[in-house]
Amino acid sequence: MFGIVILAVYAVLMIGVTLMFTRKTTDAEGFHVADRRIGSAIAAMSIAATWIWAPSLFTSSEMAYTRGIPGMFWFTVPNVLCLILFIPFAKRIRAQYPEGITLTGYMAERYHSGKVKGVYSFQLGALAVLSTAVQLLAGGKTLALITGLPFWSMTLALAAIAYSYSRFSGLKASIITDVVQLGIILMGGALLVVLSLRMTGGFDTVRAGLGAVSGEYTSLTSSTGIEVLLGYGLPMAVGLISGPFGDQCFWQRAFAIRRDRIGRSFFAGALLFALVPICMGTVGFLAAGSGFVASDTGMVNFEFVSSLLPTWVLVPFLFMIISGLLSTVDSNLCAAASLTTDWLGIGKDTVQTSRRTMLCLLIVAIAIANIPGLTVTYLFLFYGTLRASTLLPTVMTLLSKKLTGKGVFAGVLTALCVGLPIFAYGNLAGIPAVKAAGSLTTVLSSGLVAIIASRKAVKA
């Protein structure tokens, strides 16, 4: 009953905020890019909240607890850097395609290629589905553990909440709720860290846990540090650095923010985001330093807080977790909805189709999240590598390098058909070197094949 009440209160809060600060939108410009009027402060909070997905709330604690300093480093630093590196490219796409809505639309216009539009639509659409599945998987596990209700019912509840307000005004609803959600996350995280420090001996316990619960992960350059680099750090860095480039959520915000505020918005968003893995990672270090034994390391923050702090602390903790998960889910819904404009054009009918697209995405994501044995970390690493498949062709296009539509299509297709399976095999077989090779192959093959195929097309 406790968990159900929390969900109901949260749903009412998000719907109330949406109704209070936005109006129901029927035009594509307003629904997909918020009339291109978003200011820097609100945009920064929205960017940070959108980037706060399940891994930043759960995996940061897990990495601190199981892999110490190397794990936290390879999770946090690329997460922050990727948003900063994205800034010049966000500015470029806005300058080159000022009335745009999607990355797919930009690439299709540059190359006048249906194949390029198709492969980019697939990559961006698949990413939105898999990213949503991660959020539902992580959130559903937590809520099922607390409420005792079936996991599948919790994934349905989370999906219903996100859809209830996202369908009302599209990106406007996503952004205004992002502001509230980020506030909940930051205040909740600060509360958990302060209370946990008081109950475990303070920063001495944090220092004791820097080497993880095993005490073996104290350095980036040690044998265990190199092991983390190959098995986790390199695939994570590749996936994260390419993150915004292969995610329509961030291109959509680049088109929605006031043109002169893009740079400062993404920079501030990166700094705001950094506070979250730092807070949750501290909880992981405290758990390790205090000798806490987690039954599920992927849920170590929840288990540790539940065992250490008063029951009432679960209320802000749950609000924080739900906010982090749904801030990404609603952004994914808006991103997938915006892709309809590439195929149907802009009009009132497009908005109705966009709302139906949101529902379709949720149905597929719920099905994936309910696959037995699926873990947050595996799914996150997989779709992180998927994002990398379009990184180099996108960057080279924005930098005005000489590519052709056939070259771009061949490059992305090669990355998807060669690099991604290699990574998937390494991930399933638990072979760090193969995972790293798969990540690098995905990134590099798309660019190299695009260049080679483009030159051949020009010569022909």
Question: At which residue positions do the language-model features occur?
Answer:
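Membrane-embedded helix-loop-helix hairpins and adjacent transmembrane boundary segments
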Residues: 1-460
